[in-house]
Amino acid sequence: MMTLITGLLIPLLGTMLGSAFVFFMKDEMSPRLQKSLLGFASGVMVAASVWSLLIPAMEMEADSGKWAVAPAAIGFLLGMGFLLLIDELTPHLHIGTDKPEGMRSHLSKTAMLALAVTIHNLPEGMAVGVVFAGADSGATNISLAGAIAVSLGIAIQNVPEGAIISMPMRAAGNSRWRSFMIGSLSGAVEPLGAACVILLASLLMPALPYLLAFAAGAMFYVVVEELIPEASNGQHSNLSTIGFAVGFVLMMVLDVVMG
């Protein structure tokens, strides 16, 4: 039980660590560092989606022959569609822009930025929950060590994400503690989402291949719709490409070595 609780909380600790950068770094993050971190986060999320979610989803349906890919394909598309719907309905603001997206709202920029990060973190929490549910069920090739590897990978990805949230908020005039708290709270949805998936695991077990792919699709949506455009826009895009490669390889190694 303690291993499970620790696994669910590790990603939140990564967000808190990144948010704490606001205490010992200058108020504004350099464009070079921000591009590198965005690319790194993208690489980790893509690798986790492929190695820890999509491949296990297809392996669970190996007895279906050529149709083994069907649950993974359906779940992936549903995951992307779900995040697209949430993105359209929820008022939010992306980093580096003053143009709100989603439904019209009178929320402050700080609140809309926090909502954007919550949308981002939701699929990551689902991914952690579903891999732990898969490891606990014994119905997949996902081991407990493999589930912890996913949790660690997302935590590593959350370190730059926490910094990318807290430091611009500090630069906008918020206090260091307020910037740290909002950055940290943006990651609270991850353990909550993971816990909900695990609590419902017994009911959802027949649909586990779909859920694994659903989480992968949702994570891919965040990467394609948010992270890659922000990483590629403007100067220093080569740094984001290098960061992507490093993040992808790191997550791949974690999954293979620990899985």
Q: What is the role of each PLM region?
A:
Residues 1-259:
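Intrinsically disordered, metal-sensing/regulatory segments
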